[in-house]
């Protein structure tokens, strides 16, 4: 039984958690059918925390949510990483 658990159940990574949150945001947005970026400050904070675990001193320039039409929204995240040697 332990062997089955090893192959079928894995620990959730920060990427898995972020993906699930984004899916919930999108589904909630589709249900309410309104354009309210109430989640952007928390999403930005989560992205910075996750990226900071792997890369030191990330600099986020912008996080934007654009509405293309009634059913489509695009989340744009522009992040620039500076190499310590080139600074």
From Swiss-Prot:
> Tell me, which GO biological process terms does this entry list?
cell division; regulation of division septum assembly
SUPFAM superfamilies annotated for this entry? Cell division protein MinE topological specificity domain
Q: Does the keyword Cell division apply?
A: yes
Pfam families, per the entry = MinE (PF03776)
Domain of life from the UniProt record: Bacteria
* Keywords linked to the UniProt accession: Cell cycle, Cell division
Asked whether the keyword Transmembrane is assigned, the reply is no
Q: Which family does it belong to?
A: Belongs to the MinE family.
Q: Give the protein's biological function.
A: Prevents the cell division inhibition by proteins MinC and MinD at internal division sites while permitting inhibition at polar sites. This ensures cell division at the proper site by restricting the formation of a division septum at the midpoint of the long axis of the cell.
What is this protein called in UniProt?
Cell division topological specificity factor
Gene coding for it: minE
């Amino acid at each position: 039984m332990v062997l089955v658990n090893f192959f079928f159940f894995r620990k959730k990574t920060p990427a898995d958690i972020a993906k699930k949150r984004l899916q919930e945001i999108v589904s909630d947005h589709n249900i309410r059918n309104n354009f309210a970026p109430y989640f952007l400050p928390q999403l930005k904070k989560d992205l910075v925390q996750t990226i900071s675990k792997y890369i030191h001193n990330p600099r986020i320039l912008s996080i934007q949510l654009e509405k293309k039409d009634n059913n489509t929204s695009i989340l744009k995240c522009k992040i620039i990483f500076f190499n310590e040697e080139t600074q």
